[in-house]
């Protein structure tokens, strides 16, 4: 099925690994031209290189999304390379470290707020301004099942709260910008695991503590299939781990005109661990 994304100017934040890698490759495969906005320029270039034989063009613009000036510069470079932004995927986000709430420092909490809330704000405000002016565009915010399923927010309550903000923000903005032709939707990942250990950068959740605690991607896949997993798949009707392309598929749908009558919506890509 042709999603009509060929030549669409697309910005994907946090596109250097994990879910971001899947998003970049998915959009490039559909012919979209992609800017990878990431702090890890080296890892971002590895993803761009992996996409070199796909129909869409991919470039890397090293960006700290918590810095408004850096975001404005990135959006300007994207426009120079591929034209005005058609699609924005706010994927950059993360947990500083799983910690019981009363033990979490204010500094660590602020890190999560800056990345997960202000990063989305800066990118949406900057790229969205042009969308509103042109009367078209699609914004997809990658949230988390930690904002939907209490078990998934265990020791990451602050992170789940920031993602809950993004959900509410998305609905409000969808209502405000709908008359201007701009749609805003959310994709909420469940347990999504990279295909390979080296598909993520040094600053990722997986590198910092995920692999040490949960095992390698292959080990997690085996544990989920056998029912022996020590992570949040025990209540999933679909007994497998999610992969980055699962998030990409849902995001591509929201980016395309196949979803042209959908805005303010959220889909949980979690094997059924959350149902609405």
Task: Describe every region a protein language model picked out.
Residues 178, 183, 262-264:
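Short, small/polar-rich loop/turn modules that mediate ligand/substrate recognition or access, typified
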Residues 41, 62-74, 106, 245-246:
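The beta1-alpha1 cofactor-binding region of Rossmann-like NAD(H)/NADP(H)-dependent oxidoreductases
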Residues 16-17, 40:
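Conserved glycine-rich cofactor-binding loop
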Residues 49, 179, 191-235:
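A glycine/serine/threonine-rich, flexible loop-to-helix segment
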Residues 2, 95-98, 240, 250-252, ...:
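Short C-terminal tail/terminal secondary-structure segment
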Residues 99-101, 107-113, 139, 232:
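Substrate-binding pocket helix/loop in short-chain dehydrogenase/reductase
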Residues 140-165, 170-179, 191-193:
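Catalytic loop of short-chain dehydrogenase/reductase
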